[in-house]
Swiss-Prot record:
Pfam families noted in UniProt: Ldh_2
Presence of keyword Ligase: no
Enzyme Commission code: 1.1.1.337
Gene: comC
UniProt name for this protein: L-sulfolactate dehydrogenase
GO molecular function: L-2-hydroxycarboxylate dehydrogenase (NAD+) activity; sulfopyruvate decarboxylase activity
Reaction(s) this enzyme catalyzes, per UniProt: a (2S)-2-hydroxycarboxylate + NAD(+) = a 2-oxocarboxylate + NADH + H(+)
Enzyme class: oxidoreductase
NCBIfam families: sulfolac_dhydr
Main location per the UniProt record: cytoplasm
Keywords: Coenzyme M biosynthesis, Cytoplasm, NAD, Oxidoreductase
Organism classification: Archaea, Methanobacteriati, Methanobacteriota, Methanomada group, Methanococci
GO biological process: coenzyme M biosynthetic process
Xref: InterPro entries: LDH2/MDH2_Oxidoreductase (IPR053453), Mal/L-sulf/L-lact_DH-like_ah (IPR043144), Mal/L-sulf/L-lact_DH-like_NADP (IPR043143), Mal/L-sulfo/L-lacto_DH-like_sf (IPR036111), Malate/L-lactate_DH-like (IPR003767)
Subcellular compartments: Cytoplasm
Length: 344
């Protein structure tokens, strides 16, 4: 079963509008989902969409939020998302950060009371596309133990950083856990194992069973280094008044209201070395990286390069598994839509 990007976008828009989401907000949300699937972040693409529908049905996503700036300075702001779709709140927040960075060199915008926003890299690239440096971080409901522990306290807490030169672009989008929780949920849906060394069960024993991993803990990448970074992101993400630690809910469980926070940062190189000089140095460094000698059997890649290749491979459509097809079909049937209008 093949889903084309344009049909994925139409499906998401049509479904969200049935729940009262304004068309423009539905389009923004669909854009983020499609971006994830095209880049190969399938754990945050259409496979995650049924979770949003559950949250909408339960009232944990507000289809028509009153998104407000509750605190502001020339360089900073705090946004209350009124439980709106995270994609809508996130785009508004990064666009505000970019506006501030154009005026004063940097924009830092924190959000609270917003839902899961998809892939963090989408927002960092909004800044990158304005010739700025974009940074996006968020905390998630507990999935990861601190280094040396076996109790879930921290989220998988992703970070995304993006910037570009004239020739190259750099777009890093990664969880601080050894595996994103979305990938475990995807493995559970597909009934496949997760890689070794990513998670432990509830007794602290290594497991490749996604169900046992969800009961237990995901491990931080790089041991204490990943743990330290995840802990820092946990606190920084909440700087706008969101929750931290075990009080963070709703990013994976749609039956709970979302209490996580996000932080969006835009940095304008024009206020530092200058935009053109920054872009020149980006190209100089990445040229050096790309032209360096690779180890046997390896290709040297820049963060974001694989995703760009995936976009070319997947632009004409990609396969979805039977379980996901059935979930989407059920959603369509409930809303009076025909799944065959979207999936070939």
């Amino acid at each position: 079963m093949i889903l084309k990007p344009e049909n994925e976008k139409k499906l998401i828009i049509d479904v969200l509008k049935k729940f009262g989401v304004p068309e423009e907000d539905a389009k923004i949300t669909a854009d983020v989902f499609v971006d994830a699937d095209l880049k190969g972040f399938t754990s945050h693409g259409i496979g995650r969409f049924p979770q949003y529908i559950t949250a909408l049905k339960l009232g944990n996503i507000n289809p028509k939020p009153d998104i407000k700036i509750v605190k502001e300075s020339p360089a900073t702001a705090v946004i209350d998302g009124d439980l709106g779709l995270g994609q809508v709140v996130g785009k508004k927040a990064m666009e505000l950060a970019i506006k501030k960075a154009k005026n004063v060199g940097v924009g830092v915008v924190a959000t609270r009371n917003a839902n899961h926003f998809g892939i963090a890299g989408y927002y960092s690239e909004l800044a990158m596309n304005q010739d700025m440096i974009g940074i996006t971080i968020t905390n998630t409901e507990p999935a990861m133990a601190p280094f040396g522990g076996k109790e879930k306290i921290l989220g998988t807490n992703p970070i995304a950083i993006a910037f570009k030169g004239n020739k190259y672009k750099f777009s890093l989008d990664m969880a601080t856990a050894s595996i994103a929780r979305g990938k475990i949920l995807e493995a559970l849906r597909k009934k496949i194992k997760i890689p070794e060394g990513c998670a432990v069960d509830k007794d602290g024993k290594p497991t490749t069973d996604p169900a046992k991993a969800l009961e237990g803990c995901i491990l931080p990448f790089g041991g204490p280094k990943g743990y330290g970074l995840a802990l820092a992101i946990e606190m920084l993400s909440a700087i706008g008044g969101a929750e931290v630690g075990t009080k963070v809910k709703g990013t994976a469980n749609p039956e709970e209201r979302c209490t996580k926070g996000d932080l969006f940062i835009a940095i304008n190189p024009e206020f530092f070395m200058g935009k053109e000089e920054f872009k020149r140095k980006v190209d100089e460094l990445l040229d050096e990286i790309k032209n360096s000698e690779p180890a046997e059997g390896f290709e040297i890649l820049i963060p974001g390069e694989i995703e760009e290749r995936n976009k070319m491979k997947r632009k004409d459509g990609f396969e979805i598994d039977k379980n996901l097809y059935n979930q989407l079909k059920e959603i369509c049937n409930e809303l009076g839509l025909n799944i065959e209008d979207y999936i070939e």
